[in-house]
């Protein structure tokens, strides 16, 4: 009798906890490893490098963007990292400080294209940053004469 009561409680607790967990997961579309800032707007973007590989990034823009054009920064993380990790955090932080920023997955990594997967090439990484700078230079609100890059770890 006690076993059945305990089992019923465990099943009920599991259902309640599982239900709440699923509701929370559905309520949030934030896919990053860091907290979302209320100071920036984020837009998913795609662009190609000169080899035709499609790169995917998150464009971060200050919510209180002034009328004048802003400086911009392209950001990418170390080998194997994706924009939902450190590069996204750096980009979000700098956007909160008045920059338009682009955190992107390098070729062969994350949502970006390229085969084989999970390889690194200094030449391709250079082209990826060049493509990111080109992409930023034609965005509304970006001062094309004031674009920099942040390469984290091995990409620095």
Question: Regions from the language model: what does each represent?
Answer:
Residues 80-92, 106:
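The serine-hydrolase catalytic nucleophile loop
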Residues 8-19:
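Bacterial N-terminal signal peptides
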Residues 68-78:
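Short beta-strand element of the alpha/beta-hydrolase
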Residues 85, 108-120:
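Glycine-rich "HGGG/HGxG" loop immediately N-terminal to the catalytic nucleophile
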Residues 93-113:
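Conserved alpha/beta-hydrolase
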Residues 28-68:
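N-terminal cap/lid segment of alpha/beta-hydrolase-fold proteins
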Residues 141-153:
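Alpha/beta-hydrolase fold nucleophile elbow
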Residues 119-140:
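Alpha/beta-hydrolase active-site loop
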């Amino acid at each position: 009798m006690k076993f059945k009561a305990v089992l019923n409680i465990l099943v009920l607790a599991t259902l309640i906890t599982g239900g709440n967990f699923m509701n929370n997961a559905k309520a949030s579309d934030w896919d990053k490893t860091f907290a979302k800032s209320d100071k920036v707007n984020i837009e998913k973007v795609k662009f190609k490098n000169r080899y035709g590989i499609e790169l995917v990034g998150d464009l971060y823009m200050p919510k209180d963007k002034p009328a004048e054009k802003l400086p911009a920064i392209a950001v990418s993380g170390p080998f194997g990292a994706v924009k939902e990790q450190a590069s996204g955090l750096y980009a979000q932080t700098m956007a909160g400080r008045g920059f338009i920023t682009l955190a992107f997955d390098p070729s062969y990594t994350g949502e970006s294209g390229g085969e084989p997967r999970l390889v690194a090439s200094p030449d391709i990484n250079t082209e990826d940053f060049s493509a990111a700078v080109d992409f930023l230079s034609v965005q509304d609100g970006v001062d094309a004469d004031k674009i920099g890059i942040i390469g984290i770890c091995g990409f620095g």
